[in-house]
């Protein structure tokens, strides 16, 4: 005899007050991930996933839209305070931080965590246009 189908349990959303926003701004794209203090991802968004393709992905406006999408999705967890870690040299650094501030979060600190080589790999050759 077949077992009766188990009822799917409703997933209870945990409430998180403090979180960390990781903004990775490269020359081609911007990735915004909002995590709790332990590093568990609550929400994320990218410029490419927000509907921008090609060279429009690397604009400050695309980074702003991605940060707004990630910020609105993380509001469901009851997030209030954010520490912001910014990594990379891309054009969407400041606009992503401003967009998170506009979502209603209290930003406690902004930290630049861009990795800087101590004369590591050879950089790419310069563009000739």
Swiss-Prot record:
GO terms for biological process: translation. The keyword Metal-binding does not apply. One of its GO terms (molecular function) is rRNA binding. GO terms for cellular component: ribonucleoprotein complex; ribosome. InterPro entries: Ribosomal_uS11, Ribosomal_uS11_bac-type, Ribosomal_uS11_CS, Ribosomal_uS11_sf. Located on the platform of the 30S subunit, it bridges several disparate RNA helices of the 16S rRNA. Forms part of the Shine-Dalgarno cleft in the 70S ribosome. Part of the 30S ribosomal subunit. Interacts with proteins S7 and S18. Binds to IF-3. This is Small ribosomal subunit protein uS11.
């Amino acid at each position: 005899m077949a077992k009766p189908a188990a009822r799917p349990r409703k997933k209870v959303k945990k409430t998180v007050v403090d979180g960390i926003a990781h903004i990775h701004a490269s020359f081609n794209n911007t990735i915004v991930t909002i995590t709790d203090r332990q590093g568990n991802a609550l929400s994320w968004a990218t410029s490419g996933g927000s509907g921008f393709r090609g060279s429009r992905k690397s604009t400050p406006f695309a980074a702003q839209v991605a940060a707004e999408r990630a910020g609105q999705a993380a509001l469901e967890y009851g997030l209030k305070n954010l520490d912001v870690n910014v990594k990379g040299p891309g054009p969407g650094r400041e606009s992503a931080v401003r967009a998170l501030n506009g979502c209603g979060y209290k930003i406690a600190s902004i930290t630049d965590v861009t990795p800087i080589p101590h004369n590591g790999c050879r950089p790419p050759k310069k563009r000739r246009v």
